[in-house]
């Protein structure tokens, strides 16, 4: 964990107040001698006590080390694979070949020299470019020099860059995984997990700690008539790494505290995590999408048209510039959206910019995502969306000209931090007469 996160407010106020003066107005939940809840002799309860959790674990490798600058090997998409940096020819296949070569080599830097690279989904592919192996870094020469230009506008539920591991959601128990019950309630933040047995688990394993969203759980939150399943999923769930095992006491020690209570009543239990990829980086480039050819139409862009086949909104709904799924200990830095010169409207992306899903311990820093073409309903015009993501750090990042800037969605989203972020021009729409919204800088759930 990085203790610097815990003193941000004091550091910011230091120019105006002494420490003693700052403490005169600080929260009673964060006194000068504050200690993490899980380290206290009598840890507080999520149900009965007010507390500030320790969010300093968010980010690449718990923010305990800096994001690496990977030296190589280098896979130059122009010199080695024939990509066209003028933007005249489609470079999807050459860039993907370089990505695949880096993956086969066990990792490396796929380098895009200064220039514009035209890409698009090939055939029925769900993304223009795809990274599916650990250790691959996609690096440009800087966001003002390297431009990835997606020239396809029929991008419904597609991505320009997709980073993902084969597999399924966190609630899926991997074949052959050991399973054990948590033998007593965990009412507050905890790193010591008492279980029925530790057989099959080892230090270093990534695990899932979870409890069902039972009817009793829903009623406990006065949400019995509201939580019909949307956003609830399998219930409270945490992805953690085992750092130690005590076989004598059947106790697992995990790397990051739990962020909500887990009760035996709700079948609290532990199993292994499915496959994820690690050490993937996206660095130093800009990314943009061609606008829809019917952007000037006064119909087909309404708030609900995303679900109406044949409309223009239907063509672009659910598209993302970048998507990261089942990814761990990875990063995005120095990445921006941009307006391709072919666009007559000042639009950078068709709908959404960045989605992080079922991923843990990622850092997004020094990025700028903005200007969606379509800002209708159903999950469009989100600049940074974290869905079932945990311990994600979004740092020094600006979002704007969107329906919603930062979005945390679904119950399995927890431990996430926005540090020195800025959201601006919320509810903006590029299309005259198109869907718009008063929107919000932050949308959906707060982070546990």
Task: Give residue spans per PLM region.
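Extracellular beta-strand solenoid repeats
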Residues: 111, 118, 130, 137-139, ...
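Alpha-solenoid helical-repeat scaffolds
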Residues: 280-379, 384
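Short glycine/acidic-rich loop motifs that flank beta-strands on beta-rich extracellular proteins
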Residues: 107, 121-123, 143, 149-152, ...
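Extracellular "leader-to-stem" segments immediately downstream of a signal peptide or signal-anchor
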Residues: 14-310
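Bacterial N-terminal signal peptides
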Residues: 6-16
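Right-handed parallel beta-helix
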Residues: 135, 144, 278-289, 328-341, ...
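Positively charged n-region of N-terminal signal peptides that target proteins for export
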Residues: 1-5
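Active-site-proximal structural scaffolding
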Residues: 131, 200, 235, 275, ...
């Amino acid at each position: 964990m990085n203790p610097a996160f815990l003193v941000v407010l004091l550091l910011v106020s230091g120019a105006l107040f002494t420490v003693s003066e700052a403490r005169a107005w600080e929260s009673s939940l964060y006194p000068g001698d504050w200690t993490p809840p899980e380290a206290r002799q009598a840890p507080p309860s999520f149900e009965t006590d007010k507390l500030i959790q320790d969010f300093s674990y968010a980010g690449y490798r718990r923010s305990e080390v800096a994001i690496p600058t990977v030296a190589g090997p280098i896979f130059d998409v122009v010199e080695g694979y024939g990509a066209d940096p003028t933007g005249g020819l489609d470079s999807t296949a050459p860039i993907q070949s370089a990505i695949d070569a880096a993956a086969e080599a066990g990792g490396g830097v796929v380098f895009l020299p200064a220039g514009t690279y035209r890409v698009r989904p090939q055939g029925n592919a769900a993304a223009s470019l795809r990274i599916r192996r650990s250790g691959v870094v996609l690096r440009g020469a800087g966001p003002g020099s390297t431009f990835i230009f997606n020239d396809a506008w029929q991008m419904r539920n597609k991505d320009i860059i997709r980073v993902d591991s084969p597999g399924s959601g966190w609630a899926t128990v991997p074949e052959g995984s050991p399973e054990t019950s948590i033998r007593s309630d965990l009412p507050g933040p905890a790193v010591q997990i008492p279980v029925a047995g530790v057989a099959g688990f080892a230090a270093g394993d990534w695990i899932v700690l979870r409890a069902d969203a039972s009817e009793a759980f829903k009623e406990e939150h006065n949400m019995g008539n509201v939580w019909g399943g949307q956003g609830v999923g399998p219930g409270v769930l945490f992805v953690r790494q085992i750092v130690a095992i005590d076989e004598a006491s059947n106790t697992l020690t995990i790397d990051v505290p739990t962020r909500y209570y887990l009760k035996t009543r709700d079948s609290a239990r532990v199993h292994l995590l499915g496959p994820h990829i690690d050490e993937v980086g996206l660095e130093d480039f800009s990314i943009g999408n061609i606008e829809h050819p019917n952007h000037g139409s006064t119909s087909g862009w309404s708030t609900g048209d995303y679900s109406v086949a044949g409309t223009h909104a239907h063509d672009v709904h659910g598209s993302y510039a970048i998507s990261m799924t089942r990814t761990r200990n990875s990063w995005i830095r120095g990445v921006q959206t941009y307006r391709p010169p072919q666009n007559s409207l000042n639009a950078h992306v068709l709908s959404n910019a960045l989605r992080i899903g079922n991923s843990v311990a990622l850092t997004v820093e020094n990025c700028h995502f903005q200007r969606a073409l379509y800002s209708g309903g159903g999950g469009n015009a989100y600049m940074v969306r974290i869905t079932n993501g945990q311990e994600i750090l979004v740092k020094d990042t600006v979002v704007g000209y969107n329906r919603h800037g930062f979005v945390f969605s679904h119950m399995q989203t927890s431990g996430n931090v926005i540090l020195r972020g800025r959201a601006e021009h919320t509810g903006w729409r590029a299309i005259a007469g198109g869907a718009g919204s008063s929107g919000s800088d932050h949308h959906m759930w707060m982070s546990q």
